[in-house]
């Protein structure tokens, strides 16, 4: 393995890789075509790493033995294409970090639910007295944790972009929450390319490892039939009985792994809704595998607080509940949000469309949505999808304008739901920025 690493991208992944590479004696150069945030520049200066931003100096980059590409950079980017033509190894931060850690990993991926499951697994492990570190696609990068923290387990949320650049990395326990069309712009608009990317989480697993997945998801089950995994399969379902895995019977979650049984009433789960029952099943299987006490699992499931920007109740004003679901960046996530609404809803949506098809939402929108507020630069697809079934549709260009409009259109007992079904990069930095702006606008009403 060469000792000269070039890191492309100066965000969380890039900085974590720089710290870890430096610690392991690499000659490190970091290059970002955009602007590096000041807080990251401080870290680079502190650990004495050479860097550049707002440009790529090719002579320095092509001198690398290995290149770490941040997940935001597509494989088709001209720089990546050139590197591969020159035979220079290009890996992801997840792959690079795994070279320097023997600590077992619980890896969680999926189109939706992965952040909730990651947080829930971490909550269960902590309550169960297990020393685990959580990161990956949320919080600290895997590389930074490997460099700076000592744990017995890592709990990692993994995006398809992070999985695209792996070679040998494997989690001991892999969870695939579901697969619905998402990020298709990065996968030649082919769903099978995106599914293949998600399944990379299991491709290096052996018979000693575990693969937890949603048996109700046709995209997953069809793929598994044609592309079997080597690991031990633990499915979960809310539709059918599962012998070795998890299912629901008489309003109870039932988990059976190697003849050990765990049950819990769904009514006691802190997070309600069908999708959260699935999240709970996935996380409770991990707890069973790690032999956490059953009583601890039950108590932890009941006390879990949920995730910011995911169906987060913000405030009630004039008996109207404002709900922040900014993390819903695709249609499937928004489907779950609308499904869980129990009263008339003013729905704020829009942003960067990732090849969305809105057909699945039509029955729910017809039943529950009284007004739609578009928040995005281009709302044409939304207007044509829902214009015939929702009487009131308004286009806005800022969060404060959208929230004020929602305030005007809502009546006592209604919900105002921000669940955009789109990415956030047209008007906001990211979905967190979008969610924070929503909460601020609600508090300013």
UniProtKB/Swiss-Prot annotation:
InterPro entries per the UniProt record, alphabetical: Mur-like_cat_sf (IPR036565), Mur_ligase_C (IPR004101), Mur_ligase_C_dom_sf (IPR036615), Mur_ligase_cen (IPR013221), MurD (IPR005762)
Gene3D superfamilies linked: Mur ligase, C-terminal domain, Mur-like, catalytic domain, NAD(P)-binding Rossmann-like Domain
Keyword Oxidoreductase: no
Entry annotated with the keyword Membrane: no
Keywords, ordered alphabetically: ATP-binding, Cell cycle, Cell division, Cell shape, Cell wall biogenesis/degradation, Cytoplasm, Ligase, Nucleotide-binding, Peptidoglycan synthesis
UniProt function note: Cell wall formation. Catalyzes the addition of glutamate to the nucleotide precursor UDP-N-acetylmuramoyl-L-alanine (UMA).
Name of protein: UDP-N-acetylmuramoylalanine--D-glutamate ligase
């Amino acid at each position: 393995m060469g000792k000269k690493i070039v890191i492309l991208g100066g965000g969380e992944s890039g900085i974590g890789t720089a710290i870890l590479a430096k610690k392991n004696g690499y000659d490190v150069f970091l290059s970002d075509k955009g602007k590096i945030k000041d807080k990251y520049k401080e870290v680079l200066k502190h650990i004495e790493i050479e860097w550049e931003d707002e440009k790529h100096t090719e002579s320095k980059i092509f001198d690398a033995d290995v290149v770490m590409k941040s997940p935001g950079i597509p494989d088709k980017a001209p720089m990546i294409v050139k590197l591969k033509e020159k035979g220079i190894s290009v890996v992801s931060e997840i792959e690079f970090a795994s070279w320097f850690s023997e600590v077992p990993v619980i890896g969680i991926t999926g189109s939706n639910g992965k952040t909730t499951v990651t947080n829930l697994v971490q909550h269960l492990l902590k309550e169960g007295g297990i020393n685990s570190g959580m990161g990956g696609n949320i919080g600290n990068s895997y590389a930074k944790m490997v460099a700076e923290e000592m744990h017995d387990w890592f709990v990692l949320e993994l995006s398809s972009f992070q999985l695209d650049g792996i070679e040998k990395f494997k989690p001991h326990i892999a969870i695939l929450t579901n697969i619905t069309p998402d990020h298709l712009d990065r996968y030649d608009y082919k769903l099978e390319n995106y599914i293949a990317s998600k399944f990379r989480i299991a491709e290096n697993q052996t018979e000693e490892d575990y693969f937890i997945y949603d048996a109700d998801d046709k995209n997953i089950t069809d793929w598994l039939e044609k592309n079997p995994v080597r690991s031990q399969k633990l499915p979960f379902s809310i539709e059918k009985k599962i012998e070795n895995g998890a299912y629901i019977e008489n309003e109870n979650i039932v988990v059976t792994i190697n003849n050990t049984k765990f049950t819990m009433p769904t009514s006691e789960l802190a997070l309600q809704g069908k999708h959260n029952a699935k999240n709970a099943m996935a996380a409770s299987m991990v707890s069973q595998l790690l032999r956490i006490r059953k009583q601890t699992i039950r108590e932890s499931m009941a006390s879990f607080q949920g995730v910011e920007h995911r169906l987060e109740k913000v405030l009630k004003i004039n008996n109207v509940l404002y709900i922040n679901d900014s993390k819903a960046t695709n249609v499937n996530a928004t489907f779950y949000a609308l499904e869980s609404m129990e009263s008339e809803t003013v729905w704020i949506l829009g942003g960067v469309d990732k090849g969305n098809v809105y057909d699945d939402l039509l029955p729910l929108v017809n039943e529950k949505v009284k007004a739609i507020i578009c928040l995005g630069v281009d709302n044409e697809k939304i207007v044509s999808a829902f214009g015939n079934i929702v009487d009131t549709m308004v286009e806005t260009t800022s969060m404060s304008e959208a929230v004020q409009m929602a305030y005007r259109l809502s009546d006592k007992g209604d919900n105002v739901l921000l669940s955009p079904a789109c990415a956030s990069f047209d008007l906001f930095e990211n979905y967190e920025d979008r969610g924070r702006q929503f909460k601020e606008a609600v508090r300013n009403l």
